[in-house]
Amino acid sequence: MPRAPNRAPTTPPHTATAIPLPPPPFKSSPSPPIFLNMDIFSLIGLLLALVALVGGSILKGAGVSSLWSSAAFVIVILGTVAAILVHTPPPVFKRALSIARWVIRPPTNEQQALVGQIVDWSNIARKQGLLGLEPLVADQQDPFLKKGLQMLVDGLEPEAIRHMLEIDLTSQEHQDTAAAKVFEAMGVYAPTLGIIGAVFGLIAVMKNLADPSKLGHGIAAAFTATIYGIASANLFFLPIASKLKSVIGGRSREREMIIEGLIAIAQGENPRNIESRLAGFLH
């Protein structure tokens, strides 16, 4: 009986072992349209301040034209700017101009999303180690967050990370607060310059005592500078300074939350504990 030809043993096809992939890097939600990122209440407040001045002048019978005085503008507004230029170092003045927009468009606040991001990082660190976070460093847009994550990947001690980030936090907070105080100082100088403008106006009136027909108009024009000084200080400069300080405080609290989250990851805390700890910053 003929034997069947020898056949090479069949081997099952090779199947690649599935390698678990790390979760995709956190990406913040798309930036909302400009008008949605605006602080509507601040915008309404500034507009109401103008309406209050113009409307009050009209209701009092003074008219809109009485609010304009080139001499008062030069003495009060330009004088205030001149005093601030002498008062403030150039870097602080430039910073003040750059953060003035925060009154209408404050920095985006995504603290809830940031908590989720840090919790995701803690899960990656528990499964893959701190080096598993290295691919995520380049994706960070916030320099403070990027620096902290890089130090975490580099394996620095938790206290070293805290010390370095707190120095950055304190330095940035000091710079921004000094910039906000520029508007606070303008609110101090403007009323005083308004009084100076009124005195100049009264001096001009005293020179025309021989012509009684000019006295009423001259006295009214003299007090326009006082209006400029008091109104600009209490309706614009001082509220702007207070709003900027509030925004700066919020940014500092957000960075404190980042520091606590990164330290917790470095210490190997449970992600649930980290989430509970950071939730306290959201209240």
Predicted regions mapped to residue ranges:
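Helix-termination/interfacial motifs at the ends of transmembrane alpha-helices
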Residues: N37, I44-L47, V51-V64, D168-V247
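Short, Lys/Arg-enriched N-terminal segments with co-localized hydrophobic residues
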Residues: P20-N37
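Large intracellular
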Residues: I34-F35, F41, A52-A179, R251-H283
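Intrinsic low-complexity, disordered N-terminal segments enriched in polar/charged/small residues
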Residues: P13-T15
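Detector for the Zn2+-coordinating histidines of canonical Cys2His2
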Residues: T10
